[in-house]
């Protein structure tokens, strides 16, 4: 059964993860994460105006969200996660982005592997 994805929306929640969390990055995405002790994951997406106009930014946000939704079963619970888009993300297709996000998750303690 799929878990409900709770989004981080408040700026103070983003700042908390940025300042207290750890990060990993690749050419498309920077991922910040920290434990939240809530028993479920919360996710946020940050796509700056440097990426492009609103149509492009919203498309990137949708791609990030869908990739996370599909990878959610591979992630342990109890974390706040923020994905920050980098400039090259505009050139990436969905499968490239999903694989790059999977590799980032596998580098961190978030990866559950075959536990579930």
From Swiss-Prot:
Xref: Pfam families: Ribonuclease_P
Name listed for the protein in its UniProt record: Ribonuclease P protein component
EC number: 3.1.26.5
Intrachain disulfide bonds: none
KW tRNA processing (keyword) present: yes
Reactions performed catalytically: Endonucleolytic cleavage of RNA, removing 5'-extranucleotides from tRNA precursor
Keywords annotated in UniProt: Endonuclease, Hydrolase, Nuclease, RNA-binding, tRNA processing
Family the entry assigns: Belongs to the RnpA family.
């Amino acid at each position: 059964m799929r878990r409900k994805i709770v989004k981080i929306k408040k700026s103070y929640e983003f700042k908390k993860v940025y300042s207290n969390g750890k990060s990993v990055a690749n050419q498309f995405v920077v991922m910040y994460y920290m434990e939240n002790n809530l028993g479920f994951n919360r996710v946020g997406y940050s796509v700056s105006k440097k990426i492009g106009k609103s149509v492009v930014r919203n498309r990137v946000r949708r791609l990030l969200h869908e990739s996370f939704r599909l990878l959610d079963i591979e992630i342990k619970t109890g974390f706040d996660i923020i994905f920050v888009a980098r400039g090259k993300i505009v050139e990436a297709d969905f499968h490239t982005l999903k694989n790059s996000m999977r590799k980032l998750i596998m580098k961190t303690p978030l990866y559950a592997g075959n536990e579930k």
